[in-house]
């Protein structure tokens, strides 16, 4: 990853891209580029993450980061007969709230299946009348039914996705989403992603983290007021020994 970044930057100033290239030289050069604020070379370096067990609510937040590529599990073609859902920690910690939450999810599953079955029963004879075979009519009716039934599914519904971002976009993502003011689910995800990035390419992410780790808090009156503790926590994250293989 560092070599790719170095090649991208030196292409602007040299005829030969690979002359004298070494990991030590690349790391030093990346540090110099970061100090100078010259970030375009790191756009040539990308990381791809496989993410599971997150909610559709998180999906709505992460896809706001437009300099990224996303592939998300479809609710249009994947039927959620008994969907998995995410439970917020505050709800899980409250017995009465948790009971109400799980009851609501069970009712939602029942409503989803009832809607899907009813719509499928409506669409099936229509497709038969159009000349489809029984098998084709059944398949088309189910797909069309779950396409509309999915509207009843909650934000808590679990989804899976692949996300690819370049280093520059990731740094910005971490500034915003590792912040204490970010919603808990995407903050936890961003912190786990940062750990993986630091293990894979520490030189590229040595200063990555919430904005207060690079300077003052940009949140003004809405600051969490815990800047010292946040800086200490992310300093420990960066200091942790690497356990990942760099690919």
Regions found by a protein language model. Give the residues of each.
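Single conserved hydrophobic/aromatic residue that forms the stacking wall/gate
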Residues: 1-8
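Active-site loops and adjacent core secondary-structure elements that bind or stabilize anionic groups
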Residues: 11-12
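Short linear interaction motifs
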Residues: 23-33
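A glycine-rich, charged low-complexity "G-patch/RS-like" nucleic-acid-interacting patch
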Residues: 32-143, 152-155
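Generic secondary-structure signature for well-ordered alpha-helical cores
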Residues: 110, 114-117, 121, 154-158, ...
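Flexible, glycine/charged-enriched surface loops at secondary-structure junctions
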Residues: 126-128, 145-146, 203-209
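Long, amphipathic alpha-helical surface segments
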Residues: 163-247
């Amino acid at each position: 990853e560092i070599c790719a970044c170095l090649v991208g930057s030196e292409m602007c100033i040299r005829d030969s891209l690979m002359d004298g290239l070494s990991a030590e030289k690349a790391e030093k050069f990346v540090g110099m580029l970061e100090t100078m604020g010259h970030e375009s070379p790191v756009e040539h370096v990308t990381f791809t993450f496989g993410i599971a067990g997150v909610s559709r609510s998180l999906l709505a937040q992460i896809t706001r980061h437009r300099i990224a590529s996303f592939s998300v599990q479809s609710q249009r073609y994947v039927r959620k007969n008994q969907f998995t859902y995410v439970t917020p920690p505050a709800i899980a910690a409250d017995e009465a709230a948790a009971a109400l939450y799980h009851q609501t999810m069970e009712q939602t599953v029942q409503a989803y299946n009832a809607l899907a079955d009813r719509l499928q029963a409506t669409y099936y004879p229509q497709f038969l009348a159009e000349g489809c075979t029984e098998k084709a009519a059944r398949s088309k009716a189910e797909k069309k039914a779950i396409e509309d039934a999915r509207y009843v599914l909650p934000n808590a519904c679990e989804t899976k996705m692949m996300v690819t971002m370049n280093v520059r976009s990731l740094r910005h993502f971490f500034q915003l989403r590792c912040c204490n003011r970010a919603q808990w689910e995407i903050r936890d995800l961003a912190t786990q992603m940062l750990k993986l990035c630091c293990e894979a390419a520490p030189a590229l992410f040595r200063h990555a983290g919430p904005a207060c780790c690079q300077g003052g808090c940009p949140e003004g009156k809405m600051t969490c007021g815990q800047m010292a503790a946040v800086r200490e926590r992310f300093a420990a994250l960066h200091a942790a020994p690497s356990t990942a293989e760099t690919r």
